[in-house]
């Protein structure tokens, strides 16, 4: 029982004796079930479930969750069954144990498919009982703490998965301390050198800032004491992964991040929060537009606080978060606070209500998604959103991810409104459907009977619900709709000089024979469903009179599906490669010009969908494509030679290389090179990223 002691010390502080007794029983069952099993480190396996239970006990979670944590690997790794668990510990604990089990017994074509399907199962198990994910997050936290005994490649894979899925999931559920620990451990495992460098410079910077921190802390405490406001004031340290992300994603310099002095003020009630805000603004000058009220409008994960940014002593930036004790606990524990042990029942917390709402949307996604991959991508985009808050004409607040458009808003209000949307008014003014919204706007959707979604909407909507619902409807297009759409596309591709009814019947029959189709309607349906390209069919029907010159390729697979006999040009502005989302337009003399969907030169193409067409890469193409990357490096002797040598090892050829000095120590290299597809390019960039002199690698396109 000595291994149980660490857990026992934690639960003695808040659980009654009868529940502690049941936990001891669960420990003994788990210990006996895992008898003889060891972890990669050589320790007895039972140390892992005990550690997971301890993480949850530190959050003061209920005894059923702790019992399930102790037993969470029993069904998967031992002969014990669900029925055994139910008989010994009741249905609730048995369901939790079964929900947490990894369920990897099914056979999949590859590891990626298995991972995507397991993720799908995990999310669905979480929807049934959110305690499943609390146990899973604690399980992942302990696994991250003990990564050292694994192979380096396995460490990196687990760390990347943690940063992409588990840490954002903890954030989405408001469990801040778990999210932070997962980020720090994942960062250290994935980028050990960067972690070490940032840790050292942060340590040095914090030492230099002590005097200023103490001065600001004293001034804040003094002002609030004068105002008779009881409070607790503390400095707020920035975490290493947060600093790294700001340096990489926002291209901020280290010192500009560390020069911000951050503090937290904890008070007794929400009214006092606003009094403290007034005192802060009389002490230091507030920065316009930098006050955020998350008390009146909480974040999606239930987080509540007042944020203000001010100019402090000697002009230094000062950020202050103001919240109550309850809000502080919610900020740290999120939905986990709902299952913290309480002697008396309580109503659901804000975080719990919001989490349930989010999980309901996951159920809808599960029903709409065509595959595990589509589902995992939709959920990942929904895990870590920057939110905006807009209003319906009736004044209801609607929460949307940053970058959301009126179409996202329409689907957030109701699926039927999204499907029937034909226009929008924002703040009573006409507003483009593709233009992003900003917080505080009032949005009104204009609908029309019989209207339906435009496939081009998928190019600008950002919410997972909108994407899933649009895809679902487009997949279910009836044959008549496909024929009608195909007719319009083909007539447009034929140009103004000829229409379909002017094409000789023998030409149509020859094209039907070529495509092995029976009727003209079959051909039009294929075009409408995107299985055949209207410009290619138009060219064949006109005997080469179309504006697309014939292809010069005489052998091998064409890179674009269905473009046989057509000249293809890849736009040099964005240099798309297989795997990129692409769109095409016809250009006289250049044939079919392929652009990346986000290319600036075709921005706004959604307004003229008739001029553009959706195209797909041919999976069997063996062609190499030219793309461009940007590498930021320290200006050390031999760095450039090492860079080119690293690229040569990836079977890529360098077409051109230009450098540009940023400052005395850092320069940027712009490299045009060959890549077979996005996977090949990712391998090249990964090879470069681990070089000691490299700061940052990005793909360079307009």
Swiss-Prot record:
Enzyme Commission designation: 2.7.6.5, 3.1.7.2
GO cellular component, one term: cytosol
GO biological process: guanosine tetraphosphate biosynthetic process; guanosine tetraphosphate metabolic process; nucleobase-containing small molecule interconversion; response to starvation
Pathway the protein takes part in: Purine metabolism; ppGpp biosynthesis; ppGpp from GDP: step 1/1; Purine metabolism; ppGpp biosynthesis; ppGpp from GTP: step 1/2
Predominant cellular place of this UniProt entry's protein: cytoplasm
Disruption phenotype: In the presence of wild-type relA, spoT cannot be deleted because ppGpp accumulation is toxic. In the double relA/spoT deletion (a ppGpp0 mutant) there is a very large increase in biofilm formation (in a csrA-disrupted background). The ppGpp0 mutant makes decreased levels of CsrA and its inhibitory small RNAs (sRNA) CsrB and CsrC. The double relA/spoT deletion obviates persister cell formation in a hipA7 mutant.
Stretches assigned to the TGS domain: 386-447
HD domain span: 45-144
Gene3D superfamilies, alphabetized: 3.10.20.30, 3.30.70.260, Beta Polymerase, domain 2 (3.30.460.10), Hypothetical protein af1432 (1.10.3210.10)
SMART domains: HDc (SM00471), RelA_SpoT (SM00954)
Cofactor: Mn(2+)
The entry's keywords: Cytoplasm, Hydrolase, Kinase, Manganese, Transferase
Domain ACT: 628-702
PROSITE patterns: ACT, HD, TGS
Subcellular location field: Cytoplasm
GO molecular function ontology, one term from the record: guanosine-3',5'-bis(diphosphate) 3'-diphosphatase activity
Catalytic activity: GTP + ATP = guanosine 3'-diphosphate 5'-triphosphate + AMP; guanosine 3',5'-bis(diphosphate) + H2O = GDP + diphosphate + H(+)
PANTHER family: BIFUNCTIONAL (P)PPGPP SYNTHASE_HYDROLASE SPOT, GUANOSINE-3',5'-BIS DIPHOSPHATE 3'-PYROPHOSPHOHYDROLASE
Family, as annotated: Belongs to the RelA/SpoT family.
Biological function: In eubacteria ppGpp (guanosine 3'-diphosphate 5'-diphosphate) is a mediator of the stringent response which coordinates a variety of cellular activities in response to changes in nutritional abundance. This enzyme catalyzes both the synthesis and degradation of ppGpp. The second messengers ppGpp and c-di-GMP together control biofilm formation in response to translational stress; ppGpp represses biofilm formation while c-di-GMP induces it. ppGpp activates transcription of CsrA-antagonistic small RNAs CsrB and CsrC, which down-regulate CsrA's action on translation during the stringent response.
Self-association state and partner proteins as the record states: Interacts with ObgE/CgtA (AC P42641); this association is not required for pre-50S ribosome binding. Under both amino acid and carbon starvation conditions about half of the protein dissociates from the ribosome.
The name this protein goes by in its record: Bifunctional (p)ppGpp synthase/hydrolase SpoT
Gene name of this polypeptide: spoT
């Amino acid at each position: 029982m000595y291994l149980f002691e660490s857990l026992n010390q934690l639960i003695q502080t808040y659980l009654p004796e009868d529940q502690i007794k049941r936990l001891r029983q669960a420990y003994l069952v788990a210990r006996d079930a895992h008898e003889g099993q060891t972890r990669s480190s050589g320790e007895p396996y039972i140390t892992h479930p005990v550690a997971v239970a301890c993480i949850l006990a530190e959050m003061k979670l209920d005894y059923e969750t702790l019992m399930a944590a102790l037993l969470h690997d029993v069904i998967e790794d031992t002969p014990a069954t669900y029925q055994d668990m139910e008989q010994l510990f009741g249905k609730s604990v048995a369901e939790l144990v079964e929900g947490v089990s990894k369920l990897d017994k099914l056979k999949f074509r590859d590891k990626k498919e298995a991972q995507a399907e397991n993720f799908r199962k995990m999310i669905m198990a979480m929807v049934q009982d959110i305690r499943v994910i609390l146990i899973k997050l604690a399980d992942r936290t302990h696994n991250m703490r003990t990564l050292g005994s694994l192979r380096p490649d396995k460490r990196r894979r687990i760390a990347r998965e943690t940063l992409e899925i588990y840490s954002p999931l903890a954030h989405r559920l408001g469990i801040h301390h778990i999210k932070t620990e997962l980020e720090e451990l994942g960062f250290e495992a994935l980028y050990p050198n960067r972690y070490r460098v940032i840790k050292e410079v942060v340590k040095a910077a914090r030492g230099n800032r002590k005097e200023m921190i103490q001065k600001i802390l004293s001034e804040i405490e003094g002002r609030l004491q004068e105002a008779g406001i009881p409070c607790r004031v503390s400095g707020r340290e920035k975490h290493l992964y947060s600093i790294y992300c700001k340096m990489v994603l926002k291209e901020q310099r280290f010192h500009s991040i560390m020069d911000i002095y951050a503090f937290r003020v904890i008070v007794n009630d929400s009214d006092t929060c606003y009094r403290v805000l007034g005192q802060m603004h009389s002490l230091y000058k507030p920065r316009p537009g930098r006050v955020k009220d998350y008390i009146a409008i909480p974040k999606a994960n239930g987080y509540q606080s007042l944020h203000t940014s001010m100019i402090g002593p000697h002009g230094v930036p000062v950020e202050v978060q103001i919240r109550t004790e309850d809000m502080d606990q919610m900020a740290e524990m999120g939905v986990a606070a709902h299952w913290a042990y309480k002697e008396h029942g309580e109503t659901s917390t804000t975080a719990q209500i919001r989490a349930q709402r989010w999980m309901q949307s996951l159920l809808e996604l599960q029903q709409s998604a065509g595959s595990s991959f589509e589902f995992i991508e939709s959920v990942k985009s929904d895990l870590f959103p920057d939110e905006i808050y807009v209003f319906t004409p009736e004044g209801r607040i609607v929460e949307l991810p940053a970058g959301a458009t009126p179409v996202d808003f329409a689907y957030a209000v109701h699926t039927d409104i999204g499907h029937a949307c034909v226009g929008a008014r924002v703040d009573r003014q006409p507003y483009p459907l593709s233009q992003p919204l900003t917080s505080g706007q009032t949005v009104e959707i204009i609908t029309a009977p019989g209207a339906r979604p435009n496939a081009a909407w998928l190019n600008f909507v950002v919410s997972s619900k909108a994407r899933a619902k649009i895809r679902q409807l487009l997949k279910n297009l009836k044959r008549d709709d496909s024929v009608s759409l195909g007719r319009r596309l083909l007539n447009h591709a034929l140009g103004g000089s000829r229409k379909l009814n002017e094409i000789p019947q023998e030409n149509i029959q020859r094209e039907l024979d070529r495509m092995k189709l029976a009727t003209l309607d079959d051909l039009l349906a294929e075009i409408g469903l995107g299985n055949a390209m209207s410009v290619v069919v138009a060219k064949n029907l006109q005997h080469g009179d179309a504006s697309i010159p014939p292809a010069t390729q005489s052998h091998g697979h064409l890179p674009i599906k269905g473009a046989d006999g057509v000249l293809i040009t890849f736009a040099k502005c964005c240099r798309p490669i297989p795997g990129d989302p692409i769109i095409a337009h016809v250009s006289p003399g250049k044939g079919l010009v392929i652009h990346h969907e986000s290319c600036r030169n075709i921005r706004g193409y959604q307004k003229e969908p008739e001029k553009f067409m959706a195209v797909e890469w041919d999976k069997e193409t063996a062609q190499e494509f030219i793309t461009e990357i940007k590498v930021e490096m320290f200006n050390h002797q031999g760095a450039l030679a090492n860079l080119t040598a690293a690229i040569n090892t990836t079977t890529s050829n360098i077409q051109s290389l230009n450098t540009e000095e940023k400052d005395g120590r850092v320069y940027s290299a712009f490299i045009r090179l060959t890549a077979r597809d996005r996977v090949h390019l990712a391998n090249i960039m990964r090879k470069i990223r681990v070089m000691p002199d490299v700061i940052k690698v990005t793909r360079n396109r307009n």
